[in-house]
């Protein structure tokens, strides 16, 4: 393991990115394993004890600090008008419609666009204080404007982000900052919170098949899922009620067939996708590349990130498909075709069927939501580049050189 500090007894301070380091140390030590920790420096007294000394066998002081790269930083300068349109639809057609209070955002430009238009577009809809109050989220730099304008009341983080340390320390009202003045992240607790407590998970994907299964594993790029399979599934053990969870559950078309008279909620699981990427790769496909990847790699299971039966909404630049409202697979496939654009899936769209689905609220286009496409411009971004994010933070955010922009 690597950490920031160790004292002479072997107590470990892991820094802002504690994540699941203590859990790994505990699991190893209590299974007759050996725990070795590389630390940046030895000190007389650690800032706080993240791993107790009796779980540690060896400590090595490194001549240079361990390497940590930014993972969650996205440059606002690279957010397109198309992503802003999708963000507007998501906020008005999902966040606002369901009153989403507790949520997790995946990593990417689509969710960064949402974060950056909360203080502008979200404010114009009068939604501050009504949505997006409690977050299970890494400290995304693109969240700074939303935090500074009172949208995000608290963020509980899986880990930290390079350059955000001083800003986090200055906002103990929002982040999990302890008496030592630093944040203690906890991946294990965040995974549990994201699974059971969150009203909604929303994230980007690379492929969605005709049934609604989603994956970021393609023949051109096998990207990791991160926490998406856990965040992006309905927790059947959940019993606490929130407005968004309860409303979504009561909209499930076949709920009476599944639970009879008993009421049940459902987590909103949203995938955001571009119908055809800038490189010409289709987002909607008849069959996921994951099917062939399973065969090629000799896997027991296709690397599906989110399964169709968990997915409640798809947002593309065409519109939103409310999949949980569909009565059967045929209707679900028609809803997907309606927002699939110029792809092999979208080419099978039946305009008459799409019109029916729009009338029933199963498919919503921007005009159905009262959104003027021409207003989806970068002018809505609360920060248009990295310097703007630094300014919003009062100079406390120190972005990695990889992400600096004019």
Short names for language-model regions:
Residues 37-38, 61, 103-105, 135, ...:
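General beta-strand structural signal in soluble alpha/beta enzymes
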Residues 78-169:
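N-terminal active-site beta-alpha-beta segment that forms phosphate/nucleotide-binding
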């Amino acid at each position: 393991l690597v950490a920031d500090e160790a004292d002479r007894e072997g107590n470990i301070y892991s820094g802002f990115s504690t994540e699941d380091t203590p859990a790994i140390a505990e699991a190893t030590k209590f299974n007759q394993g050996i725990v070795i920790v590389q630390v940046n420096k030895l000190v007389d007294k650690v800032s706080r004890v993240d791993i107790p000394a009796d779980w540690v066998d060896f400590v090595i002081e490194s001549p240079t600090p361990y390497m940590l790269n930014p993972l969650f930083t996205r440059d606002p300068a690279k957010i397109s008008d198309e992503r802003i349109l999708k963000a507007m639809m998501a906020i008005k057609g999902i966040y606002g419609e369901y009153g989403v209070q507790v949520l997790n955002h995946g990593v990417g430009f689509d969710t960064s666009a949402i974060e950056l238009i909360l203080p502008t577009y979200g404010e114009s809809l009068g939604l501050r204080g009504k949505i997006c109050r409690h977050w299970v989220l890494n400290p995304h730099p693109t969240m700074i404007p939303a935090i500074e304008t009172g949208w995000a009341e608290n963020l509980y983080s899986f880990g930290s982000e390079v350059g955000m340390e001083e800003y986090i320390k200055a906002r103990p009202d929002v982040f999990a900052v302890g008496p030592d003045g630093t944040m203690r992240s906890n991946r294990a607790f965040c995974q549990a919170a994201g699974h059971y407590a969150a009203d909604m998970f929303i994230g980007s994907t690379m492929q969605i098949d005709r049934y609604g299964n989603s994956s970021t594993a393609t023949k051109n790029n096998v990207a990791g899922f991160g926490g998406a399979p856990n965040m992006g599934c309905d927790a059947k053990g959940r019993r606490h009620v929130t407005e968004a969870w309860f409303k979504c559950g009561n909209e499930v078309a076949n709920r009476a067939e599944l639970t009879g008279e008993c009421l049940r909620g459902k987590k909103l699981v949203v995938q955001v996708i571009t119908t055809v990427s800038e490189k010409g790769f289709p987002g909607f496909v008849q069959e996921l590349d994951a099917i062939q990847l399973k065969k090629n790699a000799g896997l027991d299971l296709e690397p599906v990130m989110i399964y169709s039966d968990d997915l409640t909404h798809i947002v593309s630049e065409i519109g939103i498909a409310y999949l949980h409202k569909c009565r059967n697979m045929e209707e679900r496939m028609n809803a997907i075709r309606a927002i699939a654009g110029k792809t092999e899936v979208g080419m099978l769209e039946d305009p008459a069927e799409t019109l029916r689905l729009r009338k029933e609220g199963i498919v919503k286009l921007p005009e159905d939501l009262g959104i003027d496409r021409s207003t989806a411009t970068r002018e809505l971004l609360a920060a248009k580049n990295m310097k703007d994010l630094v300014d919003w933070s009062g100079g406390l955010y120190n972005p990695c050189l990889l992400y600096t922009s004019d």
